[in-house]
Amino acid sequence: MEQVRLEIRRSAEGDVGRMMEIYAHARAFMAAHGNPNQWGPTNWPPEALIRRDIRQGNSYVCTHEGRVVGTFFFAWGKDIEPTYRRIADGAWLDDGPYGVVHRIAGDGSVKGVGAFCINWAYGQCGHLRIDTHGDNVVMQGLLNKLGFTRCGTIYVEEDDYPRLAYEKVGQGDGSSVPL
């Protein structure tokens, strides 16, 4: 079986159209798999947010043979995600600096894009947090498979909708600098 070669790079303005296509595919995939409310009703994420992420250097794409097949937000630092300051029904595993992944999506053309992107982000910092909707059983399964621990529930300020909070802590001091 041939190994699929995937690569990660920072997103550029020229990627926005393709990224929006990938998010449209992801919304349809989630709706078809019992998760119509996570991004569907609001056509999340908005293009303006994606452009802001790119300007701030926190937007990444996953490529296969030069074609963008996935995208995600990644940032790393101390208290990088204000929403994660309060967690209900549990506690975070570690209070040190951490990375966070948001808005991860693939176009469905290459198997393993989600795992590759999450593993890449984890490799940058060795301490990663991520959240997802209770209906997103596909993402929950992936996070469990990748060794994440469900730590509790967080509430996103924009919509106060509960999200399942996951964390993975391992070796590394976070000194790796993302692309």
Label every model-predicted segment.
Residues 109, 130-140, 158:
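Conserved beta-strand-loop-alpha-helix junction that forms the acyl-donor binding cleft
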Residues 6-21:
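A short beta-loop-alpha structural element at the N-terminal edge
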Residues 73-109:
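Conserved acyl-donor/pantetheine-binding loop and adjacent beta-alpha core of acyl/acetyltransferases
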Residues 109-123, 141-145:
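Conserved acetyl-CoA-binding loop-helix of GNAT-fold acetyltransferases
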Residues 100, 124-135:
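Conserved GNAT acetyl-CoA-binding A-motif
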Residues 28-48:
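Conserved GNAT-fold acetyl-CoA-binding loop/helix
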Residues 56-72:
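Conserved beta-hairpin
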Residues 131, 149-163:
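Conserved catalytic-core motifs of GNAT/GCN5-like acyltransferases
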